[in-house]
UniProtKB/Swiss-Prot annotation:
Residues 82-93, 133-170 have a biased composition (Low complexity). This is Translation initiation factor IF-2. It is found in: Cytoplasm. Residues 392-395 are annotated as: G4. The gene is infB. It comes from Listeria innocua serovar 6a (strain ATCC BAA-680 / CLIP 11262).
Length: 782
């Protein structure tokens, strides 16, 4: 049994709190006030004490009730003699026997304190009759009228009814009801028992918590106030406050962790954590990423494997965006991802490493380990993937595979021939040497890894590439990591959504469904997703739409808050950024991966005093809206493998917007870097242009000291800075106030001529002082 407060006990037993406190003190139990609690033992003693008091109080009430019932029977028989009244009331005078109603009032109604309604009616009825004998007149202005109080209403019946009251119909009915209602209060409902445990998620309002605890919100607000927490009925309570209240009531608390269905990562985590039926798992093709330094032969290797000329389609022989291809060798499939190799595409390569199973590290035998080779090793190790080293270009005369092996041992890649666990495969991608051995090694590693997937579930996977096609709209290249993707599936891709309208495989053929570890190009999305986003197929289009719209709105809010939010941690950074100049840049490219790579490269440019600010990135041609944004923000537009429309070109000419078009990323980076150097605060170099010797000084009121000078070297100009040198020491540095030759102002005075000079804010010029004139010349930064 839980503890009860004094006021709660008093309310339940319909007694005053003061009476309960006195009863407790009589029992030897000290309490402070009505808010004090009563334990279980004290409650038993108090119940016995209160019950005993109530029984004693009920005894006289029963006697009174019996007397009252006996008196009420008298007036029901008006023709009877007064013998009954005398027997019931032997002390009553005989002169009052003809007034049974008055007799009832004076004797029967007096002890009946629990029936105020009858007393009221009897008082009013007797007040309508004239007083008899020595009784005082009732204090009623209309009591001398036998009819009733109101002259406009007919008088009531003066004959007593069976209950002993006068039959005054329609009078004081409402008052009687009110008196009965106010005198007999309703019994308060007994509070429900407290639950053993409540479950909540995140937070609860005071009203919600009160509902769970079967208590009034006001009671919880009082408890919170006593605990030092000021809260209103609709205020949310944190976990600590909820636990504090429930602990006071002795109720257990359990926090329910809600799963955010809009978080796509949850579906991938559930796949890892849930127990999967082994009978549904089938072997899936390995996903292989080819990594390495630029121009080490990655695309040529993949080209040789596919027997196509992919390299010829790339600008400058450099892979500009990710390609995904699937090969079939020995009745088994292998999925290849071709990631660009140079440093500008580090982010793309890191993204590719997170969705693959095996990494092929291509190293040129004639070049050795390069910076991008080291980055590729770090990405593969961070992803926990096995690495197969393909030593390429062994056909060249200067090739030295042993040197490559030796250099890679520094990065914990020890060949199997040297007692390590890393597979090394010497190849020549150009002539096709050693490719079959490399493929066998890939299949061997995939068998050891036991790569399996469940094709019977809804598909999940990642975005390899995305672009905006002029005829088809948003197009995304997806890699299905688990499940089967079908045409018509409702899908959420990153912050976009849609229904799979068409699917095209790497050979350009339309397909109706694709299984795990298969790359496919889809259409039907409402917007272009980001490369590296995850996708999940849902059961219906309504769910996919709701989740996609929620994710898009959250991303927009996060983007806005990220640009405006300032905390104490980054306050100093914002202050420093306020002192820096910015180059506003808009990037448009043919594919999303190129946009990200170019943006990442521009942000890494470190030029003192200038900061790059990328205000907009998108996929597709340069349009008029881009020109409008660039004109409003004074930005430069960089187009990578895209061209401006005719309307955009005309608008750019009218608005004087600078558009730079490139096909190779290095040229775009170098051009922006050069522009940034041009925007730096210019460097100045001091150049001495002349000297003059003070031959005479003249003091003029309201003008100051005029120095009569002779130019000994160079020239003195009106806008030059000057130094006053006395005995080889600079005593003042400032600007010329006036320069005159005779009485005329002069712009400059050459060597061998005399002039008059006044210096701003300096009059302490002495004879034989030297005035040195100089200018600050701007020099180009290197």
């Amino acid at each position: 049994m839980s503890k009860v407060r004094v006021y709660e006990y008093a309310k339940e037993h319909q007694v005053s709190s003061k009476k309960v406190i006195e009863a407790l003190k009589d029992l030897g139990i000290e309490v402070a006030n009505h808010m004090s609690t009563i334990n279980e033992n004290a409650l038993r003693q108090l119940d016995n004490a209160i019950d005993g008091t109530n029984k004693k109080a009920e005894a006289p009430k029963k006697e009174t009730t019996s007397n009252e019932n006996g008196n009420s029977k008298g007036p029901n028989k008006p023709n009877m003699t007064n013998s009954n009244e005398k027997s019931n009331k032997p002390n009553k005078p005989a002169g009052q026997a003809n007034k049974p109603a008055t007799a009832n009032k004076s004797h029967g109604a007096k002890p009946a304190t629990n029936k105020p309604a009858n007393t009221s009616n009897q008082t009013q009825s007797s007040g309508n009759k004239q007083p008899a004998g020595g009784q005082k007149r009732n204090n009623n202005n209309n009591s001398n009228r036998p009819g009733g109080g109101n002259p406009n209403r007919p008088g009531g019946n003066n004959r007593p009814n069976r209950g002993g009251n006068f039959n005054n119909k329609g009078r004081n009915t409402k008052k009687k009801g009110k008196l009965n209602h106010s005198t007999v209060p309703p019994t308060p409902p007994k509070p429900k028992e407290l639950p053993e445990k409540i479950v909540f998620s995140e937070s609860l309002t005071v009203a919600e918590l009160a509902k769970k605890l079967y208590r009034e919100p006001s009671e919880l607000i009082k408890k919170l106030f006593m605990l030092g927490v000021v809260a209103t009925i609709n205020q949310s309570l944190d976990k600590d406050a909820i636990e504090l209240i429930c602990d006071d009531y002795g109720v257990q608390v359990e926090e329910e962790i809600k799963v955010d269905v809009t978080d796509l990562d949850v579906y991938f985590e559930n796949e890892l954590n849930e127990a999967v039926d082994e009978s549904k798992l089938v072997e899936r093709p390995p996903v292989v990423t080819i990594m390495g330094h630029v121009d080490h032969g990655k695309t040529t290797l993949l080209d040789s494997l596919r027997n196509t000329k992919v390299t010829l389609g790339e600008a400058g022989g450099i892979t500009q965006h990710i390609g995904a291809y699937q090969l079939e060798i020995h009745d088994k499939k292998i999925t290849f991802l071709d990631t660009p190799g140079h440093a500008a595409f580090t982010a793309m390569r890191a993204r590719g490493a997170q969705i693959t199973d095996i990494t092929i590290l291509v190293v040129a035998a004639d070049d050795g380990v390069m910076p991008q080779t080291i980055e590729a090793i770090n990405h593969a190790k961070a992803a926990g993937m096995p690495i197969i080293v393909a030593v390429n270009k062994i056909d060249k005369p200067q090739a030295n595979p042993d040197r490559v092996m030796q250099e890679l041992t520094e990065y914990e890649l020890v060949p199997e021939a040297w007692g390590g666990d890393t597979i090394f495969a010497p190849i020549s991608a150009k002539f096709g040497e050693g490719l079959e051995n490399l493929l066998d090694m890939i299949l061997l590693v995939s068998e050891v890894e036991e790569l399996k997937a469940n094709p019977d579930r809804r598909a999940i996977g990642s975005v390899i590439e995305a672009e905006l096609d002029k005829g088809r709209g948003p197009v995304a290249t997806l890699l299905v990591q688990d499940g089967t993707l079908n045409i018509g599936d409702p899908i959420v891709v990153g912050n976009t959504f849609g229904r799979v309208r068409a699917m095209v495989n790497d050979l350009g053929r339309r397909v109706k469904k694709v299984g795990p570890s298969t790359p496919v190009e889809i259409t039907g999305l409402n917007d272009v997703p980001q490369a590296g986003d995850r996708f999940v197929v849902f059961e219906d289009e309504k769910t996919a739409r709701n989740i996609g719209e929620t994710r898009a709105s959250r991303a927009l809010v996060a983007q806005r808050s990220a640009t405006n939010r300032v905390s104490l941690d980054n306050l100093f950074e914002h202050m420093k950024a306020g002192e820096m100049k910015e180059v506003n840049v808009i990037i448009k490219a043919d594919v999303q991966g190129s946009v990200e790579a170019l943006a990442a490269s521009l942000r890494k440019i470190d030029v003192e005093g200038v900061n790059v600010k990328i205000i907009h990135t998108a996929v597709g041609a340069i349009n008029e809206s881009d020109i409008t944004l660039a004109a409003a923000s004074n930005a430069i537009i960089i187009g990578f493998n895209v061209r401006p429309t005719t309307q955009a070109r005309e608008a750019a000419e009218n608005e004087s917007v600078d558009i730079r078009l490139h096909r190779v990323i290095y040229k775009a980076i170098d051009e922006i870097e050069a522009a940034m150097k041009g925007m730096l605060d210019p460097e100045f170099q001091e150049k001495i242009i002349g000297q003059a010797q003070v031959r005479q000084t003249i003091n003029v009121s309201k003008v100051g000291t005029i120095a009569g000078c002779y130019v000994t070297d160079g020239k003195i100009t009106r806008d030059s800075g000057v130094r006053i040198i006395r005995d080889g020491i600079v005593v003042f540095e400032g600007e010329i106030a006036t320069l005159k030759r005779f009485k005329d102002d002069a712009k400059e005075v050459a060597k061998g001529y005399e002039c008059g000079i006044t210096v701003q804010n300096f009059n302490d010029i002495k004879e034989d002082d030297v005035i040195e004139a100089y200018v600050m010349e701007e020099i180009e930064r290197k």
